[in-house]
């Protein structure tokens, strides 16, 4: 069995199982676990110290599913422009199998089966312990890493995913892993991110790209967000809700150069 080893355990989140469980417990502290009919979500992927509590706002609402599809931006530049992983993923909390039926449905499309893009990438990996902490029953994942994030590509991937999910009859939740504005003041980050988030909440994909380019916004997972919105809408999603917005300065105290984080769900 081919295994995708953790790349950022001990960096973005604790390496040891017990310590990781304690950190996840801290992230969910004060949140009510209330499952909703969530089809898609936007979730941050920074170190748990900074964005874990924001991410927990999403995971506290997620329903049980057969498969959790996770779109992540490719920060490393390795691998195919858009790649799906077929390997089993290992975390300090255990192993998670990939939904090979859905993964193989992409073969022959714009999405390649390629492990290199996933090997060192953190954006998908950091979501997995949250799923393992929340759900005891077996579930599978579909990790899709996007180096090519233009609107046409992301919409095509989202439409294809929605068709595959519909044909499979499986219950799936689609997660777009993305941080928002990077290394601006807290005030400016919130100003830029508010515009981008407004487009997301209105399912206005073209408007989001326009605002990203016009504001030179450093949102890293706009392709994953677009693919998630496209697929969720095609599967019946009609309402998007911002659950939480914060920035790294809320933890570090440094408001001069922050990273923005948003928790958004689509129902």
UniProtKB/Swiss-Prot annotation:
Species of origin reads Methanosarcina mazei (strain ATCC BAA-159 / DSM 3647 / Goe1 / Go1 / JCM 11833 / OCM 88) (Methanosarcina frisia)
Disulfide bond sites? none
Q: Which family does it belong to?
A: Belongs to the MEMO1 family.
Which residues does UniProt call coiled coil?
none
Which Pfam families does the record cross-reference, listed alphabetically? Memo
- The protein here is known as MEMO1 family protein MM_1761
InterPro entries noted in UniProt: MEMO1_fam
Q: Could you name the domain of life of the organism this protein comes from? A: Archaea
Please give the CDD domains that the UniProt record associates with this protein: MEMO_like
């Amino acid at each position: 069995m081919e295994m995708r080893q953790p790349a950022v355990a001990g960096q973005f989140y604790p390496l040891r199982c017990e310590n990781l469980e304690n950190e996840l417990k801290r992230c969910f502290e004060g949140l009510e676990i209330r499952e909703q009919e969530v089809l898609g979500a936007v979730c941050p992927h920074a170190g748990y110290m900074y964005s874990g509590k924001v991410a927990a706002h999403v995971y506290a609402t997620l329903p049980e599913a057969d498969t959790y599809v996770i779109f992540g931006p490719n920060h490393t530049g390795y691998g195919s422009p858009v790649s799906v992983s077929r390997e089993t993923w290992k975390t300090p909390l255990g192993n998670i199998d990939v939904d090979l039926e859905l993964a193989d449905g992409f073969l022959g499309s714009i999405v390649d089966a390629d492990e290199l893009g996933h090997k060192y990438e953190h954006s998908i990996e950091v979501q997995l312990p949250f799923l393992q902490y929340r759900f005891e029953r077996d579930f599978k994942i579909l990790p899709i890493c996007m180096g090519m994030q233009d609107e046409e590509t992301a919409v095509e991937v989202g439409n294809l995913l929605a068709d595959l999910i519909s044909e499979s009859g499986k219950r799936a939740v689609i997660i777009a892993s993305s941080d928002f504005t990077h290394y601006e003041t807290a005030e400016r980050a919130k100003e830029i991110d508010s515009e981008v988030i407004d487009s997301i909440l209105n399912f206005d994909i073209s408007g989001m790209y326009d605002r990203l380019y016009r504001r030179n916004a450093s949102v890293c997972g706009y392709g994953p967000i677009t693919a998630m919105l496209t697929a969720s809408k095609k599967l019946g999603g009609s309402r998007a809700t911002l659950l939480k917005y914060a920035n790294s300065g809320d933890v570090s105290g440094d408001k001069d150069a922050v990273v923005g984080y948003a928790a958004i769900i689509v129902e």
